[in-house]
C-alpha cells in the first residue's frame, strides 16, 4: 500500500491518527509475534490495511502489541472481528460512538423478539468496549470522558431494553401508552441509576446499580393488571436481557440490591412504600447513595419528582448531634484503613484500600451531607464537581481540591486498566512484583518503580487529606470538666456518656469507677494505675466510636480483668490512638481474639511492627521470623512453647488484619496456610531429631507429612484444624532402628506419629499449636496412625472409597525430603489420573445426601453444609477432576477455585456455571473467614452484634446485612441447581 493511500485512509480526526500515547511492552519480541501470528490468520484484504495503519501510527502499533501481551479480553475483541477494528481505527471515535448508539436503538426498535435484542445489544457492547478502551489507552479521551461514555452506554442500554419490553407489554394490551413509540412516558415506571452510573462516573467493567420504583396509580396500566406483578416482571426482564451471559457475552451486570430492604422486598417497589421506608428506616449509607441517584430511564418526569420527595431524607437542615453521628458512621466504614504506615503496591485495592478512590468519594460526600441541606449548590452528583464546589465555598483548600482531583483521575485510570485485562470488576493490583511490572508497562510506565512512585504519592496524599478532615473532637466534649471516677450518681459524667453515644451510661459509669479505683490485678502498681487514669478519657471516647459502645466497654473490662500483667499494654494503647482503635474493633467484633490478647498480651507486639499493615510476609520471611523466634530456645519444651506463641501471634495478627480490612480473605487463607506449613515443617524436624536421639534411625528411613483438607488446598481459616497423613518408608531388609532403645518398623513410625501429634496438641499456658485430625489416613480410625508408602499406594488403588479419592485431590506434601516428596506425588497423581466412569456421580450424590442427613442443610448461614453451600462447590470441583484427570491431567489443582478455572478452561465445565461457582466460592470463603474468626458456635444473625454484622457486610461487599443475606440465599440456590445438574440429587 502506498503512503498516499495510507494517508487517505487515516483522517486527522480518526482514532488511529490521534493515538498520542500508549503502553510500553514487557516482552517486545513475544508481543510482536502474537500480533504477527494473528494477522497471518486474517484475510489479506483486512490484514494489509490494518498493518498499514499500524505502521503509519507507531503508538498504535505498540498499543496493539501491548494488548496482545497484556489484555486477553481486548485481544479477543480484536481477533473476533478484524473488520470492526479497522473501521474503528479509521473513524472519528466521538461520532462513531454516537452513531453506534443510534444504530443500536434503531435495531432494537425493529427487533422481532428478545433474542434479537440481546444479540444487538451485545454487538453494541463489544464495539463500544473496544472503542472506549482504545481511546483511553491512546490518550484520546481524558478519564472523565471515558467514564461518561461508559455511563452513556449503560444508560442507553437500559433505556433501549426498557422501551422494547414496554412495547411488548403494549402489544399484549397490558399498558396503553399515549405515545406508542415511547411507551415509557407517563408509565409510572421509574429507574434510578445509583452510584457511579448516576454520577456519570461508571468504570470499565462496572456493574450498574439500579433501583426500580413504580406508581401504584400508573396511568397507562390496563385496568385489570395488578401493578406489582407487572412491574416486577418488567424489571426481571430488564435484568435478564442485560446481564445474561451468552456465547456473545453480556451487556452489563445488574445489581438491584440498593433498594430498600432487598432481602424481603420485590425487585420493583411502589413509590409510596419507598417514601415510607426512607422516612422511617433510612440509614446513613442510603443517604450517601442518594447523593448520586438519577432518574435514567422509564418515566423520567415521575423519577425526578420522586427524588425531590426523597430530598429531605438526604439533605438535613440542621447539624445536630445525630447528623454528626451519621458523619462519623460513614467515617467508621473507612476506619479500618487507619493506622497503615505503609502501602503495599502489590495487591493494593485502588478503590477501597488506603488512600484509594473510596476515601476521595467519602471526603466529598461527608461534607456534602453536613452542608448540603443549607447549601443546595453542594447537591451535585460527580465527585470532582463536589470537590470544586467545596473549594469555592471555602470548605476545603484549592490545593486539596487539586491534589484530590489529580489523585482521583489517576486512580480511576489505574482502575480501568486493571479491568481491561480480563473484563472483571476488580480494583486490585496484581499480587507479585513481576505481575505489577507487566501491569506498569501496560499502563504506560517504563518500570514498576516509576509507577509505584506515582501511585504511592497519590495514595499518601489522599490519606493525608482524608485524615485531616476528621481531626479534633467534633462533639466538643473533650473540653468538659469530667470526673470519670464519679460513678452512677455523677450527672455530669452521665450526660457526657450519653452525648458520646452510650446507651447504658449507668453501667459504663459504674465500670469507670471500678477502673479508676484500681480494683483490678494489673492496676495494683501505682505507676500503671496513674498511666491508666490519664488514658481513660481517650479510651472512653474511642470505645464510643464502636458500633456497640456499651459492649465495647464490657469487652475492654473483661480484658482488664483477665490480664495478669498489663503495664506495657496500657502504655502502648495510651500512646497510639490508631492501635486503640484497632483493639476496640477486635474487642467489639471478635471476642475470640480478645480472649487471646488477654491470655497473651505480648502478641500485640506485632501490631506495632511498621510492617504490620504492609504486604503479607511470604514463606521466606515467615521462615526467617520463625528461626529468629526459636534461635535461643533452651529445651524441647521451650522450643514448643515458643512455637505456640508464634502461632498464636500469627493467628492474632492475621485475624486483626482481616477485621481491619487491610488484607483480603484470600490473602489471609494463604497466610494461615503458610504459617501452619512453616510450623508443621519445624515440628517435624524437631520431633524427628528428638525421636532419633532416643530410638535411633532405620536404614533409609523417610517420613513425610501430607496435608489434606483446608491446609492442603491453602484455604485455611482462623479455626481450621490440620488434616494430616504421615507417610513413611525404610529399607525392607533392615527394619529395626539402631538406637539403644530399638523399635521395629511399623511400631517405630506409629510411636513417632504419636509424638508428633502430641507436640501439636498438648495444651500449656501458651495454648496449643493446632488440633490435628488424621482420620483421612487409609482406613481412617481403624487404620494405623502412619502409612508406609507402598501400603498407601495399594490402599488408594484397591480399597479407597470415592470420597477418599475426592479428598486426595487436595493432598499436598508439605514436609519431606525432595526425593520422597517426588515419590509420593507420583503415587497421588497416578491414583487421580486413572480412568473413571462418570457414574461416580452417584457416589458423590450419595455422599452429599449422607452429609445432609448428618449435618443438616437448611441453615442459610451454615455456609459449608447448606444446600448450595461450599461442600456442593468442593464436590463439583473434585468430581470434575476425578472424571477428567485421566485424559486431561492439567485439570488437577489442590484449590477449589483453581480447579474450577481449569475445568472451565478445558471445556468440561460450562462458562456460565463457572461464572456462578467462582464468585460463590469467594463469597462463602470471605464470609466463612470472618465467622470462624469471630464466632465460636453457630452464627445467628438475630443475636449477632453490629460490629460483627458490619464486618460481614464489608467482607460480602454489600450495602447492608439484609442485602448480604439475600445474596447468600440467591447464590446457594444457583449453586445447588448446578450441583443437581452436574452430579444429581433432589436439591431438597
Swiss-Prot record:
The keyword ATP-binding applies. GO terms for biological process: regulation of glutamine family amino acid metabolic process. Residues 1-474 are annotated as: Adenylyl removase. One of its GO terms (molecular function) is [glutamine synthetase]-adenylyl-L-tyrosine phosphorylase activity. One of its GO terms (cellular component) is cytosol. Coiled coil: none annotated. Keywords: ATP-binding, Magnesium, Multifunctional enzyme, Nucleotide-binding, Nucleotidyltransferase, Transferase. It holds the Pfam family GlnE. It catalyses: [glutamine synthetase]-O(4)-(5'-adenylyl)-L-tyrosine + phosphate = [glutamine synthetase]-L-tyrosine + ADP; [glutamine synthetase]-L-tyrosine + ATP = [glutamine synthetase]-O(4)-(5'-adenylyl)-L-tyrosine + diphosphate. Residues 480-988 are annotated as: Adenylyl transferase. HAMAP family: GlnE (MF_00802). Involved in the regulation of glutamine synthetase GlnA, a key enzyme in the process to assimilate ammonia. When cellular nitrogen levels are high, the C-terminal adenylyl transferase (AT) inactivates GlnA by covalent transfer of an adenylyl group from ATP to specific tyrosine residue of GlnA, thus reducing its activity. Conversely, when nitrogen levels are low, the N-terminal adenylyl removase (AR) activates GlnA by removing the adenylyl group by phosphorolysis, increasing its activity. This is Bifunctional glutamine synthetase adenylyltransferase/adenylyl-removing enzyme. The gene is glnE.
Amino acid at each position: 500500500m502506498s503512503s498516499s493511500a495510507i494517508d487517505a485512509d487515516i483522517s486527522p480526526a480518526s482514532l488511529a491518527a490521534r493515538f498520542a500515547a500508549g503502553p510500553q511492552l514487557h516482552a517486545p519480541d513475544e508481543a510482536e509475534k502474537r500480533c504477527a501470528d494473528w494477522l497471518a490468520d486474517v484475510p489479506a484484504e483486512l490484514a494489509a490495511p490494518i498493518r498499514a495503519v499500524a505502521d503509519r501510527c507507531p503508538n498504535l502499533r505498540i498499543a496493539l502489541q501491548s494488548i496482545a501481551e497484556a489484555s486477553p479480553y481486548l485481544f479477543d475483541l480484536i481477533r473476533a472481528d478484524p473488520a470492526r477494528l479497522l473501521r474503528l481505527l479509521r473513524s472519528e471515535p466521538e461520532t462513531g460512538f454516537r452513531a453506534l448508539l443510534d444504530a443500536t436503538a434503531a435495531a432494537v426498535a425493529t427487533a422481532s423478539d428478545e433474542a434479537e435484542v440481546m444479540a444487538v445489544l451485545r454487538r453494541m457492547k463489544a464495539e463500544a468496549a473496544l472503542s472506549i478502551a482504545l481511546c483511553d489507552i491512546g490518550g484520546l479521551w481524558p478519564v472523565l470522558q471515558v467514564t461518561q461514555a461508559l455511563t452513556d452506554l449503560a444508560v442507553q442500554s437500559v433505556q433501549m431494553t426498557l422501551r422494547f419490553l414496554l412495547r411488548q407489554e403494549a402489544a399484549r394490551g397490558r399498558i396503553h401508552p399515549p405515545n406508542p413509540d415511547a411507551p415509557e412516558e407517563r408509565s409510572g415506571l421509574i429507574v434510578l441509576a445509583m452510584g457511579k452510573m448516576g454520577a456519570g462516573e461508571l468504570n470499565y467493567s462496572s456493574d450498574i446499580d439500579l433501583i426500580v420504583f413504580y406508581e401504584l396509580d400508573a396511568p397507562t396500566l390496563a385496568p385489570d393488571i395488578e401493578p406489582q406483578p407487572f412491574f416486577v416482571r418488567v424489571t426481571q426482564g430488564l435484568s435478564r436481557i442485560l446481564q445474561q451471559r451468552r456465547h456473545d457475552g453480556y451487556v452489563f451486570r445488574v445489581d438491584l440490591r440498593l433498594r430498600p430492604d432487598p432481602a424481603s422486598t420485590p425487585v420493583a417497589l411502589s413509590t409510596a412504600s419507598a417514601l415510607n421506608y426512607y422516612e422511617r428506616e433510612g440509614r446513613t449509607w442510603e443517604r450517601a447513595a442518594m447523593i448520586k441517584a438519577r432518574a435514567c430511564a422509564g418515566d423520567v418526569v415521575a423519577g425526578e419528582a420522586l427524588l425531590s420527595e426523597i430530598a429531605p431524607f438526604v439533605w438535613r437542615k440542621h447539624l445536630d448531634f445525630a447528623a454528626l453521628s451519621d458523619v462519623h458512621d460513614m467515617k467508621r466504614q473507612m476506619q479500618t484503613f487507619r493506622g497503615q504506615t505503609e502501602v503495599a503496591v502489590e495487591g493494593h485495592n485502588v478503590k477501597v484500600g488506603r488512600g484509594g478512590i473510596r476515601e476521595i468519594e467519602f471526603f466529598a460526600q461527608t461534607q456534602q451531607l453536613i452542608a448540603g441541606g443549607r447549601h443546595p449548590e453542594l447537591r451535585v452528583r460527580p465527585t470532582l464537581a463536589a470537590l470544586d464546589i467545596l473549594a469555592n465555598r471555602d470548605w476545603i483548600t484549592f490545593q486539596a481540591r487539586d491534589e484530590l482531583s489529580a489523585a482521583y483521575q489517576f486512580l480511576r485510570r489505574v482502575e480501568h486498566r486493571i479491568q481491561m485485562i480480563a473484563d472483571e470488576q476488580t480494583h486490585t493490583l496484581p499480587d507479585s512484583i513481576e505481575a505489577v511490572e507487566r501491569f506498569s508497562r501496560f499502563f504506560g510506565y517504563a518500570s514498576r518503580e516509576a509507577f509505584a512512585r506515582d501511585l504511592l504519592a497519590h495514595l499518601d496524599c489522599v490519606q493525608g487529606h482524608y485524615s485531616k478532615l476528621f481531626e479534633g473532637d467534633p462533639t466538643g466534649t473533650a473540653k468538659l470538666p469530667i470526673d470519670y471516677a464519679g460513678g452512677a450518681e455523677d450527672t455530669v459524667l452521665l450526660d457526657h456518656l450519653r452525648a458520646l453515644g452510650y446507651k447504658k451510661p449507668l453501667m459504663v459509669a459504674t465500670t469507670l469507677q471500678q477502673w479508676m479505683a484500681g480494683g483490678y490485678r494489673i492496676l495494683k502498681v501505682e505507676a500503671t494505675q496513674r498511666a491508666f487514669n490519664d488514658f481513660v478519657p481517650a479510651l472512653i471516647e474511642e470505645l464510643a466510636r464502636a458500633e456497640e459502645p456499651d459492649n465495647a466497654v464490657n469487652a475492654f473490662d473483661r480484658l482488664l480483668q483477665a490480664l495478669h500483667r498489663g503495664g506495657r499494654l496500657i502504655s502502648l494503647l495510651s500512646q497510639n490512638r490508631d492501635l486503640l482503635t484497632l483493639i476496640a474493633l477486635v474487642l467489639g467484633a471478635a471476642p475470640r481474639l480478645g480472649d487471646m490478647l488477654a491470655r497473651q498480651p505480648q502478641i500485640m507486639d506485632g501490631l506495632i511492627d511498621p510492617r504490620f499493615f504492609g504486604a503479607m510476609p511470604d514463606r521466606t520471611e515467615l521462615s526467617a521470623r520463625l528461626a529468629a523466634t526459636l534461635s535461643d530456645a533452651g529445651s524441647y519444651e521451650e522450643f514448643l512453647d515458643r512455637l505456640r506463641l508464634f502461632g498464636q501471634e500469627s493467628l492474632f495478627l492475621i485475624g486483626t488484619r482481616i477485621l481491619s480490612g487491610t488484607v483480603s480473605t484470600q490473602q489471609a487463607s494463604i497466610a494461615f496456610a503458610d504459617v501452619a506449613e512453616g510450623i508443621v515443617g519445624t515440628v517435624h524436624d524437631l520431633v524427628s531429631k528428638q525421636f532419633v536421639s532416643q530410638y535411633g534411625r532405620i536404614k533409609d528411613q523417610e517420613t513425610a507429612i501430607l496435608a489434606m483438607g483446608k491446609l492442603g488446598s491453602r484455604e485455611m481459616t482462623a479455626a481450621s484444624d490440620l488434616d494430616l497423613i504421615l507417610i513413611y518408608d525404610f529399607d525392607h531388609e533392615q527394619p529395626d532402628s539402631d538406637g539403644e532403645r530399638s523399635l521395629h518398623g511399623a511400631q517405630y513410625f506409629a510411636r513417632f506419629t504419636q509424638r508428633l501429634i502430641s507436640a501439636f496438641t498438648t495444651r500449656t499456658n501458651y495454648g496449643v499449636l493446632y488440633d490435628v485430625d488424621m482420620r483421612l489416613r487409609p482406613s481412617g480410625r481403624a487404620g494405623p496412625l502412619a502409612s508406609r508408602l507402598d501400603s498407601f499406594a495399594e490402599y488408594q488403588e484397591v480399597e479407597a472409597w470415592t470420597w477418599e479419592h475426592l479428598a486426595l485431590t487436595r493432598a499436598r506434601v508439605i514436609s519431606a525430603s525432595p526425593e520422597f516428596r517426588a515419590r509420593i506425588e507420583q503415587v497421588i497423581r497416578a491414583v487421580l489420573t486413572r480412568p473413571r466412569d462418570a457414574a461416580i456421580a452417584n457416589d458423590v450424590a450419595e455422599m452429599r445426601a449422607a452429609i445432609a442427613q448428618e449435618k443438616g442443610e437448611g441453615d442459610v448461614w451454615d455456609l459449608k453444609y447448606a444446600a448450595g453451600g461450599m461442600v456442593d462447590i468442593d464436590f463439583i470441583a473434585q468430581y470434575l477432576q476425578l472424571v477428567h484427570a485421566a485424559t486431561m491431567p492439567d485439570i488437577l489443582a489442590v484449590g477449589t477455585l483453581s480447579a474450577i478455572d481449569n475445568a472451565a478452561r478445558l471445556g468440561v465445565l460450562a462458562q456460565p456455571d463457572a461464572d456462578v461457582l467462582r464468585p460463590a466460592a469467594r463469597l462463602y470463603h470471605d464470609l466463612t473467614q470472618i465467622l470462624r474468626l469471630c464466632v465460636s458456635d453457630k452464627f445467628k444473625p438475630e443475636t449477632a452484634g453490629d460490629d460483627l454484622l458490619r464486618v460481614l457486610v464489608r467482607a460480602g461487599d454489600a450495602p447492608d446485612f439484609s442485602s448480604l443475606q439475600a445474596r447468600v440465599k440467591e447464590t446457594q440456590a444457583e449453586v445447588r441447581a448446578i450441583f443437581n445438574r452436574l452430579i444429581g440429587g433432589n436439591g431438597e
